[in-house]
Swiss-Prot record:
Organism lineage string: Bacteria, Pseudomonadati, Pseudomonadota, Betaproteobacteria, Burkholderiales
Any Gene Ontology CC annotation: large ribosomal subunit
Protein name: Large ribosomal subunit protein uL10
HAMAP family, per database record: Ribosomal_uL10 (MF_00362)
Superkingdom field: Bacteria
UniProt family annotation: Belongs to the universal ribosomal protein uL10 family.
Keywords from the named record: Ribonucleoprotein, Ribosomal protein, RNA-binding, rRNA-binding
Binding partners and assembly: Part of the ribosomal stalk of the 50S ribosomal subunit. The N-terminus interacts with L11 and the large rRNA to form the base of the stalk. The C-terminus forms an elongated spine to which L12 dimers bind in a sequential fashion forming a multimeric L10(L12)X complex.
Gene Ontology molecular function: large ribosomal subunit rRNA binding; structural constituent of ribosome
PROSITE patterns: RIBOSOMAL_L10
Keyword Flavoprotein found: no
Function: Forms part of the ribosomal stalk, playing a central role in the interaction of the ribosome with GTP-bound translation factors.
GO BP: any one term: translation
Stored InterPro entries: Ribosomal_uL10, Ribosomal_uL10-like_sf, Ribosomal_uL10_bac, Ribosomal_uL10_bac_type, Ribosomal_uL10_CS_bac
Length: 173
């Protein structure tokens, strides 16, 4: 059923609001995907904080007008699904991981930091750890020397505690 003009304006406004907050948009062709598979993809995207939407390309072009993603409009042809995320890598990760298990989803393009990315660049972006993963790695690196020092102190304390009763018995005898 076609959308009337008010519905189209509402869709463009909703997508524009998501685009305004986004760091990355990834575009993929979804021709031939079953409803069940698409539902799984939407569920995964929702868990990862990715706004996933199938919409008319003309509405998507209007939504990205005047944004850093406007250059992506040339890539908006055919049946596409749009992954929009505030995190730089999560939309690329979600769609790339799904494309690995489902050959009917084909990554087409993306946009990050005002630059249009081809499918290979989107896959490369998906291989980068997310912000949360990088923070966890940094904390692990920072915490390792402190925890090693704490284990050393605990081992010394345990060794001294074991040796102290033997010395007390020898002194008392």
């Amino acid at each position: 059923m076609p959308l009337n003009i008010e519905d189209k304006k509402a869709v463009v406004a909703e997508v524009s609001a998501q685009v305004a907050k986004a760091q990355t948009i990834v575009v993929a062709e979804y021709r031939g995907i079953t409803v069940g598979d698409l539902t799984k993809l939407r569920s995964t995207a929702r868990q990862q904080g990715v706004y996933l939407r199938v919409l008319k390309n003309t509405l998507a072009r209007r939504a990205v007008e005047g944004t850093p993603f406007a250059s992506l409009a040339e890539q908006m042809t055919g049946p596409l699904i749009y992954g929009i995320s505030e995190d730089a890598v999560s939309s690329a990760k979600v769609l790339n991981d799904f494309a690995k298990t489902n050959d009917k989803l084909v990554l087409r393009a993306g946009s990050y930091d005002g630059k249009v990315l081809d499918a290979a660049a989107v896959k490369a972006l998906a291989s980068i750890p997310s912000r949360d993963e990088l923070i966890a790695q940094l904390l692990g690196v920072m915490q390792a020397p402190v925890s090693g020092f704490a284990r050393l102190l605990a081992a010394l304390a345990a060794k001294n505690a074991e040796g102290a009763p033997a010395e007390a018995e020898a002194a008392g005898a």
